[in-house]
Amino acid sequence: MRLTDYTDYALRVLMYVGAQAGRLVTIQEIAINHGISKNHLTKVVHRLGLAGLVQTVRGRSGGVRLARDPATITVGSVVRLTEPDFIMVECFDEARNTCSLSPVCVLKHALGRATGAYLQELDRISLASVLPGAGGARMTGA
């Protein structure tokens, strides 16, 4: 299973902002520190804001900061928010499934259990546990 760049960027934003101890961080700062397009990050931050994970403040002195305690944000919840679907194989999508093996396929159920276990493990990882000081890499601010 591979996560999209969108999810990767969302996790990076949350980790970077979470490491700033409530300081407002500009999207430009995050973009520069991670080598990511500011325009793309703007979309990511907007989505995180709509989900109540970050607070955005407009204006000259504006920026982004966490809207919740990082201990209450799980990697699993972020992945579910930002990934378009978890359709690993065609038969996971009933509307598009044309596989003739589907009615008797055991693999479909095994893959479904594996996906569930993957997400369950990600639900055990809080944002707080991956921030600097919790074993994470040091992140610098401007």
Predicted regions and their residues:
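N-terminal helix-turn-helix DNA-binding core of bacterial DNA-binding proteins
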Residues: 3-5, 11-36, 55
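Alpha-helical residues within the helix-turn-helix
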Residues: 32, 49-50
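Key DNA-contact positions within bacterial/archaeal DNA-binding proteins
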Residues: 39
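Beta-hairpin "wing" of winged helix-turn-helix
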Residues: 52-67
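Charged, amphipathic alpha-helical coiled-coil/dimerization segments
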Residues: 63-80
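C-terminal regulatory/oligomerization modules of transcriptional regulators
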Residues: 74-75, 93-142
